[in-house]
UniProtKB/Swiss-Prot annotation:
Gene Ontology cellular component annotations, sorted alphabetically: small ribosomal subunit
Name of the gene encoding the protein in the UniProt record: rpsL
SUPFAM superfamilies, per database record: Nucleic acid-binding proteins
Gene3D superfamilies: Nucleic acid-binding proteins
Key words, A-Z: Methylation, Ribonucleoprotein, Ribosomal protein, RNA-binding, rRNA-binding, tRNA-binding
Coiled-coil region: none
Record's compositionally biased regions (Basic residues): 125-141
Name under which the protein is recorded: Small ribosomal subunit protein uS12
GO biological process, one term: translation
Native source species: Methylacidiphilum infernorum (isolate V4) (Methylokorus infernorum (strain V4))
Amino acid sequence: MPTINQLVRRGREKLKRKTKAPALDSCPQRRGVCVQVMTRTPKKPNSALRKVAKVRLTNGKEVIAYIPGEGHNLQEHSIVLVRGGRVKDLPGVRYHIIRGTLDASGAVGPSNTNKLNRNVSRSKYGVKRPKAGAKPASKAK
């Protein structure tokens, strides 16, 4: 426990907050090149083949980033935009690839529907707004 005089002279040291996405260097997004596109299996209670890519960022750091949505067109040497945000059941995956920018195309619709266009959560998957003349999706009865 410091004395009052020591506190007057030095003061207390502020606790530094650790960043959750250190490879971005305090930037909201970073551009990068896909080095390898692969699938990973999630942690214990879950089972799937999650699509991920190893990306070399413009600052020279290599990270593993998740490819959200269903279906993708990424391959080696694709240019992508990476944001922070971890995937809870994939250890070591702390970044997401932004769909609909650079070489990453927008996602197609969910597989539990028979339509190929995504109408909900479009902004998260880089899907453009449907044309005004297009017929609306049929409602299940």
